Amino acid sequence: MNPNRKIITIGSICMVIGIVSLMLQIGNIISIWVSHSIQTENQHQAEPISNTNFLTEKAVASVTLAGNSSLCPISGWAIHSKDNGIRIGSKGDVFVIREPFISCSHLECRTFFLTQGALLNDKHSNGTVKDRSPHRTLMSCPVGEAPSPYNSRFESVAWSASACHDGTSWLTIGISGPDNGAVAVLKYNGIITDTIKSWRNNILRTQESECACVNGSCFTVMTDGPSNGQASYKIFKMEKGKVVKSVELDAPNYHYEECSCYPDAGEVTCVCRDNWHGSNRPWVSFNQNLEYQIGYICSGVFGDNPRPNDGTGSCGPMSLNGAYGVKGFSFKYGNGVWIGRTKSTNSRSGFEMIWDPN
């Protein structure tokens, strides 16, 4: 083959290879483009998608606390809790408190207390001996824990208070203001729902313990008047934090303060403090229509402090050592009574529960 034909042949072969290579590249480009188009189409293809959002909340069980059962028969008592607040307060932040009490819902028990707006071993704790001051508040914390700013919940401005749970929400009652014009503020689930104004303008005050709830209604007893003479006493019926009925007791020669109330067989019984002239405790029992009966615990085991030595009981005020007094409680059961009282007859020291079957 002459040189010219060789050159032409080699050039033709190179041209064919180049054309084939070009066609392969074009095919590759077309393949990539088609593949990309298919993926893009799939990404934008409309498909029915279920996008239902289910909002889940922690359900809080609501019940009706009927209170229709009678008190359980028991043979003794056991200690439930102790917070050791004074000991812990020597190093930790613990409130200066008085008037503590426990109240339970169907889900939890809480300790309620009246603070003095100060901590133990702090400069503001000096002079915190007054029963009524603008610094006092009702607060609560889990039962058994020392009351501190870190575990306590504000409930109400108060120097006298009560609280209870109806099966749905907490009801709190906080009394504050001047002695001649105090006001009780009712809160239900933390919201102010009603008020009760002092009707005798002489230190309106209430239980310093839990109110009692029966079939969705809650009941409390309040006092307005002298602490050493005849005063005025009212029972209040509340529903969802609002007063729906009240009645003033016709109770001459009786003195009711700081009542301790409990439901019993669909009714409510309260055992109270006579600060006027009784070393035994007055009681009032009423139904849900506020029809009531009154009396004094007749037992010769006297429950107040100061008090005389045990002896012959009286169904009226036992006047021996009858002046002054202390909050306390008793549980009437059948013809007998469980009496809670101080061990000392003349000082607020010690505690004991005594069963008097008569």
Swiss-Prot record:
Location comes to: Virion membrane; Host apical cell membrane
Cofactor(s), by name:
Ca(2+)
> Where does the record place the region Hypervariable stalk region?
36-70
**One BP term from GO:** carbohydrate metabolic process
GO molecular function, a single term: metal ion binding
Catalytic reaction(s) noted: Hydrolysis of alpha-(2->3)-, alpha-(2->6)-, alpha-(2->8)- glycosidic linkages of terminal sialic acid residues in oligosaccharides, glycoproteins, glycolipids, colominic acid and synthetic substrates
Q: Which residues lie on this side of the membrane: Virion surface?
A: 28-358
The answer, when asked if Disulfide bond is one of the entry's keywords, is yes
Q: What spans does the record annotate as topological domain Intravirion, numbered to this chain? A: 1-6
Keywords on record: Calcium, Disulfide bond, Glycoprotein, Glycosidase, Host cell membrane, Host membrane, Hydrolase, Membrane, Metal-binding, Signal-anchor, Transmembrane, Transmembrane helix, Virion
Which residues does UniProt mark as catalytic?
131 (proton donor/acceptor)
- Give the membrane topology, semicolon-separated if more than one: Single-pass type II membrane protein
Cofactor binding, per record: Binds 1 Ca(2+) ion per subunit.
Glycosylated residues are 68, 126, 215
Name the major location.
Answer: virion
UniProt-annotated binding residues for Ca(2+)? 274, 278, 304
- What other facts are recorded? The influenza A genome consist of 8 RNA segments. Genetic variation of hemagglutinin and/or neuraminidase genes results in the emergence of new influenza strains. The mechanism of variation can be the result of point mutations or the result of genetic reassortment between segments of two different strains.
Q: What is this protein called?
A: Neuraminidase
Classification lineage: Viruses, Riboviria, Orthornavirae, Negarnaviricota, Polyploviricotina
Gene field: NA
